[in-house]
């Protein structure tokens, strides 16, 4: 009798027999393997932000004020924002809107529900931020503002969208360097947010809480110093920190200084993003300073730091809008840069979306489409890391995923249609995806 190849898959979900792959799903094995680390919400681990399915999330998105800052009660543009391939939207909201239309829009939580629903239906993580205390320096007012999240109606919404929601407690609140006594002010900053976090956790809120840097969001150094302590004091250790890169003065608009500030935050090993990145900064007048944002976003790409562009539309500085009228077809020159720049653009370098939002659950089988394209062929299959893809069309580059739906980096070997997977990703089962309907499974580990 001819000797048969040995089974090499460690999870008993794949049998290799005479070079063919037969997928045998063992329900309990898959359930235990896949769901053991699943949680009800987004959470953090060291620097990483993880989805409820345990997938790593690199937040790349856009800031947006739905309903035109409360002045257009029927205006929602999430469908248009989704065309940028953003995987998150930071949603501007108010506890108390101004008189007239904004007051009625923000007080009606069904409007917030509609915004959240549209956002998640488009596969984007909503980040609710309260704008009432922007650039203010009142700890007591900030604590009172954050209690808005624990009121019954808001908590119902948090529970409804808990699998895909981040709460940005307040926009750019409190001062540290600006007080003239940074050491004392950092203590106040940390104490204030400790109180807020404890209050919200005591009310049963478990989703990640995002904390903006002080000094109108610019002071990343302060977050680097107090962030580890805030994380430690959070009963759930589930905080994300956010700086806003209006760094004309803070970093001298200089890429070297930017790298130094970012390096300090990386050394602190805290999960952080740039919650606002823009091309122009206000001061005495609107749009006063041109910001050196491109080097910053290159650093973000190299260091795998998330960022969100300010702002989609209806900004007081029209040249700082991604879209001139809220439609994807009307991107400004700044918007074109943020969406299509070959080095860091949202569309040209898209971040993977939350697995839960892609599939509606954490079931690994929903990621695996067991259908093979007849025009694609992997040679050899199984392989030891290097393989060729036959059937590629002109200009096509294969995209490879593992069984968890995570994108796997491959390198071109220098010859046409020949590629290599790095050793850190193997052994394993992968598939090549070309467009929506063309895919082919293959195995990397070898036949013994």
At which residue positions do the language-model features occur?
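C-terminal outer-membrane/trafficking sorting elements
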Residues: 371-448
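N-terminal secretory signal peptides that target proteins for export/translocation
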Residues: 1-18
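Extracellular glycoside hydrolase catalytic/binding regions
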Residues: 41-42, 66, 70-71, 143-151, ...
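Bacterial N-terminal signal peptides
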Residues: 18-33
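Aromatic-lined substrate-binding rim segments of carbohydrate-active enzymes
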Residues: 74-135, 144-147, 197-203, 292-301
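N-terminal carbohydrate-binding accessory modules
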Residues: 37-88, 102
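Low-complexity, Pro/Thr/Ser/Gly/Ala-rich linker/spacer regions in secreted
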Residues: 36-39, 358-374
């Amino acid at each position: 009798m001819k000797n048969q190849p040995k089974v090499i898959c460690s999870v008993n979900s794949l049998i290799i027999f005479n070079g063919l792959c037969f997928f045998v799903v063992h329900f309990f094995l898959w359930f235990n393997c896949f769901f053991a680390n699943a949680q009800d919400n987004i959470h953090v681990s060291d620097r990483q932000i993880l989805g409820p399915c345990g997938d790593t999330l690199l937040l790349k998105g856009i800031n947006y004020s739905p309903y035109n800052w409360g002045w257009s009660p029927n205006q929602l543009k999430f469908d248009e924002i989704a065309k940028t391939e953003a995987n998150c939207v930071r949603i501007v909201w108010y506890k108390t809107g101004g008189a007239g239309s904004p007051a009625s829009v923000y007080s009606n939580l069904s409007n917030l529900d509609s915004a959240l629903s549209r956002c998640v239906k488009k596969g984007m993580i909503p980040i609710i931020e309260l704008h009432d205390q922007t650039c203010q320096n009142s700890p007591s007012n900030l604590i009172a503002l954050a209690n808005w999240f624990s009121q019954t109606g808001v908590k119902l919404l948090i529970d409804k969208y808990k699998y895909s929601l981040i709460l940005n407690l307040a926009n750019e609140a409190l001062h540290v360097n600006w007080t003239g006594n940074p050491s004392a002010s950092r203590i106040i900053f940390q104490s204030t947010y400790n109180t807020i976090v404890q209050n919200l956790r005591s009310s049963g809120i478990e989703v990640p809480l995002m904390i903006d840097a002080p000094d109108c969001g610019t002071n990343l150094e302060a977050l680097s110093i107090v962030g580890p302590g805030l994380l430690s004091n959070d009963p759930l250790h589930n905080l994300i920190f956010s700086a806003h890169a209006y760094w004309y003065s803070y970093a001298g608009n200089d890429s070297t200084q930017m790298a130094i500030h970012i390096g300090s935050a990386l050394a602190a090993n805290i999960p952080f993003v740039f919650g606002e990145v823009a091309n122009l900064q206000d001061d005495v007048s609107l749009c006063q300073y041109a910001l050196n944002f491109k080097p910053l976003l290159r650093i973000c790409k190299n260091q795998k730091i998330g960022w969100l562009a300010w702002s989609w539309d209806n900004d007081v500085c029209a040249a700082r809008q991604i879209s001139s009228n809220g439609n994807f077809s009307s991107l400004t020159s700044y918007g074109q840069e943020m969406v299509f720049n070959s080095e860091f653009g949202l569309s040209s370098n898209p971040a993977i979306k939350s697995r839960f939002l892609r599939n509606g659950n954490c079931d690994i089988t929903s990621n695996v489409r067991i259908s093979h394209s007849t025009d694609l062929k992997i040679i050899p299959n199984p392989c030891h890391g290097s393989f060729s893809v036959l059937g590629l069309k002109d200009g096509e580059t294969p995209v490879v995923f593992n069984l968890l739906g995570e994108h796997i980096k491959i390198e071109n070997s220098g010859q046409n249609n020949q590629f290599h997977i790095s050793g850190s990703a193997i052994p394993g089962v992968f598939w090549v995806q070309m467009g929506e309907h063309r895919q082919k499974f293959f195995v990397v580990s070898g036949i013994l």
